[in-house]
């Protein structure tokens, strides 16, 4: 027998004798459970946490056999029944022991409130933060925290409204109802303006230099009227071919013209439109829009006003416990089943072997929890906190998958769940909401010519910065107590201290042509902004001395922007065609789309860092939505033509989302999970554009890796956080201004405007290489490198002497490569196509090339920084 035949016989015998896997079919063996599971004697798999927990989860009780008596850890509280729970759950107002002993009066009556807390009374074990007293909300179960509060006393520079609310004295007699009860506009004398001011028709005053400058500063545009200026104001906006220009100056998509939904501020896109009628196969909503007829009464609000789901009838009338559906299709009352009379055409209501038999009497019907006997047959049910994973077996419900079931942190337990709060928050037992501990949170928003603040608890309403021109974007560095805003008229970004009563502000960044939004990186001390005119996203240091384009391609109408310096990502919206929300590293790498479907006009975005979600407003769809930070798990929070008529910007804090609506000129708030509990916080605004929450917990502290080992990370220009994709991701990378590349050392900058000339000199036989650079920005010193390369004499015969040796070397190399190719074909190989893996491994191989001693940051060797900056130049 030949060698090949022997090998074949040996392989056949090995296959026949090889033991089969335990999960193979046809062996009769039980399926193998996961390492995190326990296998019952009957083969069922349960989570390992349920073994020896005192509760029989296997039908045969095998999970509670041979169990050693459990001992609680030192950090646990021992319940009276022996159960262990974390000590922090003791006396928190929520019974966690099955016997409730963690909340017993014996355990909790001696509870001592911590510093900065107050007791809810002699007969209460509840403690609340001092800042929650007299905040207008009942936080104690007894409501004692809101008793004997008295009237709020306003400061000398504030006005007390009839309702007791405090507002800035600058709001009194300004022609707007800022108290919301009109008391700030009572008994007002006719307003007068200064010698160098112009009085608008609304009685407000503006500098005389702002009149007839083609920029309406009066809310009624009287400073640019034909009567005042002798001409119509010149509208400088020029829209691209895919857009139309509104009468009020802005640009919108052509396809939005005459679609029944006003998108222009003045509604000019819906003027002189032909009357619309829906096709026969369509349903006409009450607002005049058309949807496909199949979408009517489908259980989903397809019309913005929800009229497609009104007066819908349930076509299936055979629902509920009092009905029985025959196999032949009829629907009869359950009382007619097993009454020895034919009510179904096929006699399916009178099965001989199933009527008057209680299957639950034998082995509980095979049900793991509850067996319910029915007139015909039976059904299995589960205890609270459990659900059927098949028709008989109950498994734990993961309640934490339900949005909003907990305010912040949800811990899934067997048959239930536990809610907790993040650091800096405390749970309000009355509402279950995690509320911030410390100073009162407030909303700060732009109002065109000023910046205002309203407290979220006491509703104090004041003016922070006044005498501005056209404020459109806003953010803050809360730790530094600084505000940053962009002014459209002055094409610049400004800064001011939030507690500066004088109102001084400084121009930080100039030549910002059409700033749509700004976002402050509070960890690395930089600022990001979108520019709708130049179609760019830029980044700069907070003092404005160093700046660059981060992205200047594939942007149509960049709008809102948000940053997460803790993970190194920046997010922005773009309402161009096609509209989308994108995500990228804050250093300009790893750009990718986040939301691309069912999105039309994403005006505002904001991040919920605690829940790791992104929220956005769609002004065209009149919708507030959210996704996780990978673009998954999309949810619609609110859809409303009334409260989301033309939303512009939004922000999130605790369990509330707040937004500005441009058409209603108001600030609204709602529950961020459900969109319920709608409330109006401020109205009668004047072209408000942006809004933020001001509280220390909005910007969690983080480590600035650029200052960890050396100043600015050793970078010559900008040091920017890198996206934290995996454990191998660098903490930061160096970045250069537009027109410059990062050198191989990963730190220094080199001009991309380099020209190379060759000049041959007979005397030295060398070629001179000279570099000519363009304009060098401040702070960048680019040195010109000149090298000499020896040129061999012409006509030399030295090359002929080494030619045989060269041919021999080439033959040896060729033979080696052929051997390598043969060896490669006879080896097992593994392909790694995952781009993240490829990028990571390439980085690991190149991490130490030309890098300083700090190991936390480096450039991306696998993705050339040079080519990226070339694209941005």
Curated annotation (Swiss-Prot):
Entry-linked InterPro entries:
6-blade_b-propeller_TolB-like (IPR011042), EGF-like_Ca-bd_dom (IPR001881), EGF-like_dom (IPR000742), EGF-type_Asp/Asn_hydroxyl_site (IPR000152), EGF_Ca-bd_CS (IPR018097), LDL_receptor-like_sf (IPR036055), LDLR-related (IPR051221), LDLR_class-A_CS (IPR023415)
**Protein modification:** Ubiquitinated at Lys-839 by MYLIP leading to degradation. Glycosylated.
Q: Which residues form the LDL-receptor class A domain?
A: 31-69, 70-110, 111-151, 152-190, 191-231, 237-275, 276-314, 316-355
The residues the entry assigns to the signal sequence are 1-27
Q: Where is the EGF-like domain?
A: 356-395, 396-435, 702-750
Question: What does the UniProt record report as the effect of altering residue 825 to R in this chain?
Answer: Insensitive to MYLIP-triggered degradation
Q: Where is this motif: Endocytosis signal?
A: 832-837
The annotated topology with respect to the bilayer is:
Single-pass type I membrane protein
Region (Microbial infection) Interaction with Semliki virus spike glycoprotein E1, annotated ranges = 117-139
Disulfide bonds, which pairs? Answer: 33-45, 40-58, 52-67, 72-84, 79-97, 91-108, 113-127, 120-140, 134-149, 154-166, 161-179, 173-188, 193-205, 200-218, 212-229, 239-251, 246-264, 258-273, 278-290, 285-303, 297-312, 318-331, 326-344, 338-355, 360-371, 367-380, 382-394, 400-410, 406-419, 421-434, 706-719, 715-734, 736-749
Q: Which SUPFAM superfamilies match?
A: EGF/Laminin, LDL receptor-like module, YWTD domain
Gene3D superfamilies documented for this protein: Laminin, Low-density Lipoprotein Receptor, TolB, C-terminal domain
Q: Where are the transmembrane segments?
A: 798-819
According to the record, mutating residue 94 to I results in: Complete loss of entry of Semliki virus into the cell
Recorded GO molecular functions are:
apolipoprotein binding; calcium ion binding; calcium-dependent protein binding; cargo receptor activity; low-density lipoprotein particle receptor activity; reelin receptor activity; very-low-density lipoprotein particle binding; very-low-density lipoprotein particle receptor activity
Q: Which residues lie on this side of the membrane: Extracellular?
A: 28-797
Record note on quaternary structure: Homooligomer. Binds to the extracellular matrix protein Reelin/RELN. Interacts with LRP8. Interacts with LDLRAP1. Interacts with SNX17. Interacts with DAB1. Interacts with PCSK9. Interacts with PAFAH1B3 and PAFAH1B2, the catalytic complex of (PAF-AH (I)) heterotetrameric enzyme; these interactions may modulate the Reelin pathway. Interacts with STX5; this interaction mediates VLDLR translocation from the endoplasmic reticulum to the plasma membrane. Interacts with CLU.
Q: What's the stated role of this polypeptide? A: Multifunctional cell surface receptor that binds VLDL and transports it into cells by endocytosis and therefore plays an important role in energy metabolism. Also binds to a wide range of other molecules including Reelin/RELN or apolipoprotein E/APOE-containing ligands as well as clusterin/CLU. In the off-state of the pathway, forms homooligomers or heterooligomers with LRP8. Upon binding to ligands, homooligomers are rearranged to higher order receptor clusters that transmit the extracellular RELN signal to intracellular signaling processes by binding to DAB1.
What is this protein's name?
A: Very low-density lipoprotein receptor
Q: Organism, per UniProt?
A: Homo sapiens (Human)
